[in-house]
Curated annotation (Swiss-Prot):
Gene expressing this chain: rplS
Pfam families, alphabetized: Ribosomal_L19 (PF01245)
Example GO molecular function: structural constituent of ribosome
The protein, known as: Large ribosomal subunit protein bL19
Domain of life assignment: Bacteria
């Protein structure tokens, strides 16, 4: 192991649940506004997970008031308080970019049995 791997290993989180593209998540994000700190919930479908190690990220998509919102989070960020898996989705792709074009019921993902 070289020096960078040792530094990265010290920053890795161990409380990250197993999730993949198609799963519905609750991401609890720490938001700092001035002197106050609060937790903001972002709930949506994982459309991609990429990278590895300390640089690993995932993108969550939700529809808010009829507008699609996507947010990319680093998996090991200290600003993420916790990640909860709500539903396991049954998909055959690793990147679900096609969901951007779908509307309404067509954008739903089957639940894994």
């Amino acid at each position: 192991m070289n020096i960078l791997d040792k530094i990265d290993a010290a920053s890795l989180r161990d409380d990250v649940p197993a999730f993949r593209a198609g799963d519905t998540l609750d991401v609890h994000v720490k938001v700092i506004e001035g002197t106050t700190t609060r937790t903001q919930l972002f709930k949506g479908v994982v459309i991609r997970r990429q990278g590895g190690g300390i640089r690993e990220t995932f993108t969550v998509r939700k529809v808010s008031f009829g507008i699609g919102v996507e947010r990319t989070f680093p998996v090991h960020s200290p600003n993420i308080e916790k990640i909860e898996v709500i539903r396991r989705g049954d998909v055959r792709r690793a990147k679900l970019y096609y969901l951007r074009e779908l509307r309404g019921k067509a954008a739903r993902i089957k639940e894994k049995r």
